[in-house]
UniProtKB/Swiss-Prot annotation:
Species this chain originates from: Rhizobium fredii (Sinorhizobium fredii)
Its biological purpose: Component of the type III secretion system (T3SS), also called injectisome, which is used to inject bacterial effector proteins into eukaryotic host cells. Acts as a regulator of the HrcN/SctN ATPase activity.
One GO BP annotation of this record: protein secretion by the type III secretion system
Localization terms from the record: Cytoplasm
TM regions (residue ranges): none
Keywords, ordered alphabetically: Cytoplasm, Nodulation, Plasmid, Protein transport, Transport
Protein name: Type 3 secretion system stator protein
UniProt cross-references to NCBIfam families, sorted A to Z: HrpE_YscL_not (TIGR02499)
Pfam families reported for this sequence: T3SS_SCTL
GO CC terms in record: cytosol
Subunit relationships: The core secretion machinery of the T3SS is composed of approximately 20 different proteins, including cytoplasmic components, a base, an export apparatus and a needle. This subunit is part of the cytosolic complex.
């Protein structure tokens, strides 16, 4: 009986891992079908802007770790974030381990993943479940 339970737990964990990995892309495809094409880079900019405005408005400086292909776009978008008017200074660094849809924001408060995949996992509760070690 314990072997059967162990196999079931393993199978559920494997299925959850596959779902967690593939669900964000599936949601993007469904949204594209419903709303038409959109630029994932624009979504990344919106996610970063949203996080900075809502959570890091009082921070002195934040650093965005992004894929090399996103550096120029994000630098243009956040050129006005210079540390004045309660906006943090935004510094951008390349991280070769990140995909074009990923971004990690580092600040004096800690770091947080801001990419579309990370937001969907958080919204769907995958991160909470992973932290708790539950299935």
């Amino acid at each position: 009986m314990s072997g059967l339970i162990a196999r079931a737990v393993t199978e559920v964990a494997q299925r959850k891992a596959v779902l967690e990995k593939e669900l964000p892309q599936l949601v993007i495809e469904i949204l594209s079908d419903l709303l038409g094409a959109f630029n994932p880079g624009e979504l990344l900019v919106r996610a970063v802007r949203h996080a900075i405005e809502r959570r890091y408005n009082g921070a002195e400086e934040v650093c965005l770790h992004v894929c090399a292909t996103q550096v120029d776009m994000l630098a243009r978008e956040f050129a006005g974030c210079d540390g004045r008017e309660k906006r943090p200074k935004v510094r951008i660094e390349t991280d070769p381990t990140l995909s074009p849809q990923e971004c990690v924001l580092w600040s004096e408060y800690g770091n947080v993943a801001l990419g579309l995949d990370a937001q969907m996992r958080a919204a769907l509760g995958f991160e909470y479940l992973s932290e708790e070690g539950e299935l």
